[in-house]
Amino acid sequence: MQKICVIGAGTMGSGIAQVFAQNGFEVILRDIDMKFVEKGFGTIEKNLQRNVDKGKITADEKNEILSRIRGTTNLEDAKEADFVVEAAIENMDLKKQIFKELDEICKMETILASNTSSLSITEIASATKRPEKVIGMHFFNPVPVMKLVEVIKGLKTSEQTFNVVRELALKVDKTPIEVKEAPGFVVNRILIPMINEAIGILADGVATAEDIDEAMKLGANHPIGPLALSDLIGNDVVLAIMNVLYEEYGDSKYRPHPLLKKMVRGGLLGRKTGKGFFEYK
């Protein structure tokens, strides 16, 4: 397995492309518009330059890594890939459409993975004629730094597919954990309701955003507070995951807080928009 195709050049897609390229894989980075591909390349270049400045890699190594990544807007280019990982937005209809097209384009032996943070792998796989070769490969943000990968089996995912993806995660210096499909998987089922609760505490006026985050950092030994983490993940992404949990389980503990909804409606999405629970310059 030498050639990887990453669908989506946003925050997650560009990070995934970087990690594979750093570990010797040829990468096709695809998005619907060249401006998104170029933005993804810019993010990768900036990340690698930071590593050069810190003395972790040389300028030549940086250029070598970048040379392994090829940008495209043509989904047909995925036919060259031995492995595809999709990192589009968290929208089931969109993901199913992408997987339907990939199923028609890609070689029959190609494994199709989704970086979804909460959606059903079984449902995504239903759009294909190869459900045994569809799997979840959930990376965490920032991808080049975070070690964990949740490897999620759908109802029909084969053991062989799981083993290949688990080995692939190890090859890119990640720690894979095996997850049976369930809404939110492991990390987000625990983490996102905690963030939602912190938003509720803020909305109730119990404490300021700064003090809520300080409390969790010093009182629970968290490296980052829940509200700053929500800003980092993207408040729109947090809301999308809460909606999935609430729709799937129907349990009020997963109901997204009205303040979170209001912030997303108002475009206060966190770091990517410069303002969320905190301001960013």
Curated annotation (Swiss-Prot):
Gene3D superfamilies: N-(1-d-carboxylethyl)-l-norvaline Dehydrogenase, domain 2, NAD(P)-binding Rossmann-like Domain. Keywords: Fatty acid metabolism, Lipid metabolism, NADP, Oxidoreductase. Pfam families: 3HCDH (PF00725), 3HCDH_N (PF02737). It is an enzyme of class 1 (oxidoreductase). GO terms for molecular function: 3-hydroxybutyryl-CoA dehydrogenase activity; NAD+ binding. It catalyses: (3S)-3-hydroxybutanoyl-CoA + NADP(+) = acetoacetyl-CoA + NADPH + H(+). Pathway: Lipid metabolism; butanoate metabolism. PROSITE patterns: 3HCDH. Its EC number is 1.1.1.157. The record marks 138 as: Important for catalytic activity. Belongs to the 3-hydroxyacyl-CoA dehydrogenase family. This is 3-hydroxybutyryl-CoA dehydrogenase. It comes from Thermoanaerobacterium thermosaccharolyticum (strain ATCC 7956 / DSM 571 / NCIMB 9385 / NCA 3814 / NCTC 13789 / WDCM 00135 / 2032). The gene is hbd.
